[in-house]
């Protein structure tokens, strides 16, 4: 097969015929890396032969599980470990309740508040009452995406209720997540316990998408679990092969440059890494760069 056709197959996700391939996470999650999927696919297909037999792919900061799903779809014989530190798999179990609450809120606003329009105090109070009265599962990330202005994040229902509300309610139900985590081992533990278990094993790929240092982390279940010390610890634990994500809103690339110049601890792990840059936008911060670096 020509290199061009291999590239096209990677982009189009043709490796798992007759199985649904998710190109975005089933439920909202800030920073789910969907803009990088085609690049992840190309890198995996280039460096891991066939269906990945004998490989272990560890999604260390699992987030939405989208990277784990993508890896398993492309390399079905690899062992894929999804470290679900944010409880995303539990959220997927409650999509029916999430859709019921979405419909209740949608019905309250439809025809009264225009899409993206601000809610009055009276209507906001009505929506809060509907949420409080709802007996099923209440998904904070979904509520924030429906009722807060683009990209805003909160860490609690109380923080949500303190914000201005906007009609950003999704127009249709979320699809089921059937098959999303099929064949994937779901765990939940700290990265500094997880990574060392695989450090002396061959054919282990680390997928590293930590909360970005120096940025707001409210969308993560444990908002303060990744700080400067954790960042430095992660850098020292990292060894090739890996795929590592960062943003220019943090100073990750600058730090890697410093490591190379100063020959600090573990600098060789990042020597001659390759970098892919994707332009991204945020409602408040304008255009910024997301980075994917990798080394095999």
Swiss-Prot record:
Keyword tags: Methyltransferase, Transferase
PROSITE patterns named among the record's database cross-references: N6_MTASE
A GO biological-process term: methylation
EC nos: 2.1.1.-
Matching InterPro entries: SAM-dependent_MTases_sf
Class in the EC hierarchy, top level: transferase
GO molecular function, one term: methyltransferase activity
Family: Belongs to the N(4)/N(6)-methyltransferase family.
Protein name: Putative methyltransferase HI_1523
